[in-house]
Amino acid sequence: MEGLAVRLLRGSRLLRRNFLTCLSSWKIPPHVSKSSQSEALLNITNNGIHFAPLQTFTDEEMMIKSSVKKFAQEQIAPLVSTMDENSKMEKSVIQGLFQQGLMGIEVDPEYGGTGASFLSTVLVIEELAKVDASVAVFCEIQNTLINTLIRKHGTEEQKATYLPQLTTEKVGSFCLSEAGAGSDSFALKTRADKEGDYYVLNGSKMWISSAEHAGLFLVMANVDPTIGYKGITSFLVDRDTPGLHIGKPENKLGLRASSTCPLTFENVKVPEANILGQIGHGYKYAIGSLNEGRIGIAAQMLGLAQGCFDYTIPYIKERIQFGKRLFDFQGLQHQVAHVATQLEAARLLTYNAARLLEAGKPFIKEASMAKYYASEIAGQTTSKCIEWMGGVGYTKDYPVEKYFRDAKIGTIYEGASNIQLNTIAKHIDAEY
């Protein structure tokens, strides 16, 4: 299968360009600042530079970033408001993600994927989030959690069975959290009891993202509660398995187009062959995937904040009060400069964590830093943007209030901000 960049570049020729008109409909894509347009990585060693800037990308990464930006503006932006109001992701958006190759970015071409870099995944999530954070997290979960776990821990048979489906048509869902297992995720109560060649799952899960559309559920259940978290094991459960019940989607503040549902398991029989990896290693797999996933969430929050910022700045440059532009007031200039600096810092933290992961270097502390900081900054940025736009920013006629609502989840899911601070402090303690 030809690479993602090639396919996207071919498709991009069919996409028309859109430019923001100040205070036009929020379906129109936002202005993009020059500072966020990074250059491709060209002749670095020839120029005597041994270490490229973090915002310098390979040709493939630049093509992916550019093509996903066009896809998001053309095919997602016109539907964002409707999807938010209806709490439903449009089928055309999901189909588009698969058709563009965005649901199997790092998966080997042997299984129908693209075989691109982890930073490519980060760039895709960031660009999608500039337009709609719901679509971004839909893509993020598939790539950083589901695909990654199967790629790393699946048997050859499991890879051959599931990866081609996950890259072309099937949505995956990661099932860890429970009513009594949120931040304390390994206090889960879902059981998996062995009966012959099967394991029988009983219990429930909460806050399961993408559950409404998922065809495959990666479920964490305990095969031996007497040994605590060391009994947690990963199971691959197909949607049509008898006894698996998917509840009504939650009515959420933000990320409304991304379904979040409770699940119930009533004597769900799962073949022993559907155990992912080793028995009792589920907690290790979950920790590992969440460490990577936190970089993905950092990218989501970064993109969300940048998208909101890009939409707002043209307004304050054109809005006239007291005979001059809002942007000409020094007090507002300082606020804008402060937010822009924070966005740049969040971007560098996120890209650095991604590059460390790609290089096989320790990255857990840096991933937590990126996730923590980007999430906090997303909340601050979107709040400021509403203030800068004034009354219109508070209405649903424009996207700023949605960015604000979507941003809040960043400090909560895939490890709350305080959990990230705990992780960072733990590593600092060990370093000294």
UniProtKB/Swiss-Prot annotation:
GO biological process, any: fatty acid metabolic process
Substrates-to-products reaction catalysed: 2-methylbutanoyl-CoA + oxidized [electron-transfer flavoprotein] + H(+) = (2E)-2-methylbut-2-enoyl-CoA + reduced [electron-transfer flavoprotein]; (2S)-2-methylbutanoyl-CoA + oxidized [electron-transfer flavoprotein] + H(+) = (2E)-2-methylbut-2-enoyl-CoA + reduced [electron-transfer flavoprotein]; (2R)-2-methylbutanoyl-CoA + oxidized [electron-transfer flavoprotein] + H(+) = ethylacryloyl-CoA + reduced [electron-transfer flavoprotein]; butanoyl-CoA + oxidized [electron-transfer flavoprotein] + H(+) = (2E)-butenoyl-CoA + reduced [electron-transfer flavoprotein]
SUPFAM superfamilies associated with the record: Acyl-CoA dehydrogenase C-terminal domain-like (SSF47203), Acyl-CoA dehydrogenase NM domain-like (SSF56645)
Tissue: Ubiquitously expressed.
Enzyme class: oxidoreductase
Family: Belongs to the acyl-CoA dehydrogenase family.
Official protein name in the record: Short/branched chain specific acyl-CoA dehydrogenase, mitochondrial
Natural source organism: Homo sapiens
Gene: ACADSB
